């Protein structure tokens, strides 16, 4: 049986990925969290029906969200991440020797728990 995940972008456009299996699904107080396994992208985290990250290309998002502001700040020492429960943004920030502390605030602790389990 073919399993597919589709993310609707507009009434005329949707992005579909063939799925090997669903590893996790739950509805939290804040959102629905799904983890899928796919041949093309590896593991995928989907929140409320939208792909948040995939193993194959998550670094692209996290590098851009971190390296651009870090390039223009003269000497960042303390950083606050709002959201980012998957940990990728924190990982990229901790590559900078001048960063002394990173605080991460995530509204949904299950995103952190599930990321630790399925997206180490």
How would you describe each model-predicted region?
Residues 1-44:
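N-terminal auxiliary segments of SAM/dcSAM-dependent transferases
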Residues 2-4, 53-120:
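The AdoMet/dcAdoMet-binding core of the Class I SAM-like
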């Amino acid at each position: 049986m073919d399993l597919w995940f589709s993310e609707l972008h507009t009434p005329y456009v949707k992005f579909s990925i063939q799925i090997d299996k669903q590893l996790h699904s739950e509805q939290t107080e804040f959102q629905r969290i799904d983890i899928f396994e796919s041949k093309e992208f590896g593991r995928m985290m989907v929140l409320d029906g939208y792909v948040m990250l995939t193993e194959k290309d998550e670094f692209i998002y996290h590098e851009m969200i971190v390296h651009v502001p870090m390039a223009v700040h003269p000497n960042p020492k303390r950083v606050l991440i709002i959201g980012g429960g998957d940990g990728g943004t924190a990982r990229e920030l901790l590559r900078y020797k001048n960063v002394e502390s990173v605080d991460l605030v995530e509204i949904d602790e299950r995103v952190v728990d599930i990321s630790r389990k399925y997206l180490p």
